[in-house]
Amino acid sequence: MTGKSQGDEIIIPFKNLINDAYCRDISIKIRSHLDVKRKNGEYIGAFVPYGYEKSDDDKHKLVIDIYAAGIVKEIFRLKLHGMSQDAIATQLNNEGVLAPMEYKQSTGSGYQTGFLQNDKSVWSSVTVRRILENEIYIGNLVQGKRTTPNHKVKQEVVKPESDWIRIEKNHEPIISDRDFEIVQRLLGMDTRISPDSDMVYNLSGLSLIHI
């Protein structure tokens, strides 16, 4: 028994070392494979951004979802006219526009979100802002923002922006570059809200335009 026990003390750690090396090697290969796809402009997310859908011919290619893209355009139009994110969300909810999760589920997707009201997903200022800030709508595909430190740690961390994989003009845009840039400037200056909270004071004298 003593001999067997001493053998186990040597063999078991060795097996663990081999298994760990194998898992690390597999993890590195998977990461490398996914990065190649990202650099090739292939969309590898499970759920597509609101306003787009996966092409029937290529699941890694984004194409415009006509209905949702129309809502995205309206959100940008309202922002360009000075409305706050909260006011935009309220208007969309009042008009009965399905929030992204509800819309995706209506199309057969299992997408989930935390913004619920009476067990129903609703538009929120956070959702609106995420859309307004997302350069996916000018045709840029940005992926690889998060990672896990190694194969043993499951908790994701945000990577430095310099390490993100950005492919510009990768797919058909919904919003023009000019309108997107103006909106980013407006978002950066949303520091004063008018008394009724519906409109944001124009702090810069920017010339707003229609989409």
Question: Model features per residue range: what roles?
Answer:
Residues 1-209:
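Conserved catalytic breakage-reunion loop centered on the nucleophilic residue
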